[in-house]
Regions:
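Compositionally biased terminal segments of proteins
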Residues: 1-199
Length: 199
């Protein structure tokens, strides 16, 4: 069943960590919850919860969540069942999921593109890094590295994204700030409001 897109009862961070604790693939918390793990405290409400998995681990992901209902955003903005054995090609980035007995969406999974031992951003092909460097533990939970998470938030620049950026800005290391500035220049050649604050 495809629920209304606004019907969410998201897992908690602890529940996500327990679900994937022994998974045979790398995963990391993403979105606003990843920001809060970096900060070490909650700063706002959340409608959903997101994780990332490398695209080439998708079959292992499917097997790991064999007791769940999985739906691919294909095309983006439209959900359809993700069938067993189906390979989700580039262009299909998001998976929505719920346990078979649930009555609302519980988890969103985003697939990260790879090129050999590198991860590659959808924002710009020159924005990339070692796969081993993308996910880092913040307060014992694997998360998307904060500067990368902020890059993804920069596109929408919604009020919640602005709040997340402002909360993280004083805590960014010099290297993280420099990386984010360079990535924003590539992804937003027309300019971005955050660049002046990262100078």
């Amino acid at each position: 069943m495809i629920f209304p897109y606004t019907r969410w009862t998201p897992l908690s961070v602890a529940e996500v960590a327990a679900l994937f604790r022994d998974a045979p693939f790398r995963w990391g918390l993403a979105g606003g919850y990843a920001v809060e793990q970096f900060l070490g405290m909650p700063i706002r409400a959340h409608d959903d919860i997101d994780i990332v998995v490398f695209r080439d681990d998708q079959h292992q992901l499917y097997q790991w969540l064999h007791a769940w209902r999985l739906f691919a955003a294909d095309p983006p903005g439209t959900l359809r069942p993700w069938n067993q054995g189906e390979w989700l090609a580039p262009g299909i980035h998001d998976i929505w999921a719920y346990e078979r007995t649930a009555h609302a969406w519980q988890l969103q999974i985003m697939l990260i593109e790879t090129d050999g031992d590198m991860w590659v951003s959808r924002r710009h092909p020159m924005i990339r890094g070692l796969r081993t460097d993308l996910l880092v533990p913040y307060h014992q939970i694997p998360c998307v590295r904060i500067e990368v998470q902020l890059l993804y938030k920069a596109k929408g620049n919604r009020p919640k994204d602005q709040l997340d950026f402002q909360a993280c800005l004083p805590l960014l290391t010099r290297d993280a700030s420099a990386w984010l500035r360079q990535a924003l220049q590539l992804a937003h050649p027309e300019g971005h409001a955050w660049l002046a604050l990262l100078a």
